[in-house]
Amino acid sequence: MTKVGLRIDVDTLRGTREGVPRLLATLHRHGVQASFFFSVGPDNMGRHLWRLIKPRFLWKMLRSNAASLYGWDILLAGTAWPGKNIGNANAGIIRETATYHETGLHAWDHHAWQTHSGHWSIRQLEEDIARGITALEAIIGKPVTCSAAAGWRADGRVVRAKEPFNLRYNSDCRGTTLFRPLLMPGQTGTPQIPVTLPTWDEVIGPAVQAQSFNTWIISRMLQDKGTPVYTIHAEVEGIVHQPLFEDLLVRARDAGITFCPLGELLPASPESLPLGQIVRGHIPGREGWLGCQQAVSAS
């Protein structure tokens, strides 16, 4: 049996309102638990449209047929009007999710984090994280124990900024296996659970067709030599491609794959995890930099 961590990112108002309830119903039908990471502040995702002037982002939008995939309400959110507060508008849905699934913070403002966190100071990072955690805890009525950086925009500064919040783990980068981030010689931070597998929007196109994606990604899960972690998005697999995701759950089960919340991947003694650090890097299919796992020597 292959155990795969299932991470569900919720970036937008529509993803929370429409995608999450459908995902909850789908997961319940198949007896699967996952980790949900919510954006809880304003939905300003439409402000990413200016990035269309960048060839790699434009190609990604065309390759994934973004208008059909996400819908114009997502693509224009926060452009001609102020972005609506996601958490306030969907508190009941978020609370229901936290009743049945591991629930953590994705971002206060997903667009702001993805656009500006790379040059924010440690203090600005801490203030933004605190704002999101405070809002999410007020909604779910219990402490937030995990987080996942929006757009995988993370580096050593983000790792340090999250330390005061005493989280059980973070999932801030792409990599191969769980690790303890090295803060300074002799001092490590909160365990990191990297995403190891590509997302739908990173690979769909000439190389991988939509109808063959499930076969392709299951093959990647079974071949993963580290600790497999797969990310879906409420805006994609919870809305337009919900039938495809349900088919994935069936096929994965038949292939001997069991999905689980990311927290279940942590060992009893996190001190046994290897050391590592998060550095800025790039991966195929995703525009811009993102956090990538890098091994470091124990010496």
Curated annotation (Swiss-Prot):
GO terms under cellular component: membrane
GO MF annotations, alphabetized: hydrolase activity, acting on carbon-nitrogen (but not peptide) bonds, in linear amides
Catalysed reactions listed for this entry: 4-deoxy-4-formamido-alpha-L-arabinopyranosyl di-trans,octa-cis-undecaprenyl phosphate + H2O = 4-amino-4-deoxy-alpha-L-arabinopyranosyl di-trans,octa-cis-undecaprenyl phosphate + formate
Record bears the keyword tRNA processing: no
Pathway terms, separated by semicolons: Glycolipid biosynthesis; 4-amino-4-deoxy-alpha-L-arabinose undecaprenyl phosphate biosynthesis; 4-amino-4-deoxy-alpha-L-arabinose undecaprenyl phosphate from UDP-4-deoxy-4-formamido-beta-L-arabinose and undecaprenyl phosphate: step 2/2; Bacterial outer membrane biogenesis; lipopolysaccharide biosynthesis
Keywords from the UniProt entry: Antibiotic resistance, Hydrolase, Lipid A biosynthesis, Lipid biosynthesis, Lipid metabolism, Lipopolysaccharide biosynthesis
Keyword Coiled coil in annotation: no
Start and end residues of each NodB homology domain: 2-260
GO terms (BP aspect): 4-amino-4-deoxy-alpha-L-arabinopyranosyl undecaprenyl phosphate biosynthetic process; lipid A biosynthetic process; lipopolysaccharide biosynthetic process; response to antibiotic
UniProt xrefs under Pfam families: Polysacc_deac_1
EC number(s) reported in the record: 3.5.1.n3
Gene3D superfamilies per record: Glycoside hydrolase/deacetylase (3.20.20.370)
Function: Catalyzes the deformylation of 4-deoxy-4-formamido-L-arabinose-phosphoundecaprenol to 4-amino-4-deoxy-L-arabinose-phosphoundecaprenol. The modified arabinose is attached to lipid A and is required for resistance to polymyxin and cationic antimicrobial peptides.
Family per record: Belongs to the polysaccharide deacetylase family. ArnD deformylase subfamily.
Protein name: Probable 4-deoxy-4-formamido-L-arabinose-phosphoundecaprenol deformylase ArnD
Origin species: Salmonella paratyphi A (strain AKU_12601)
Underlying gene: arnD
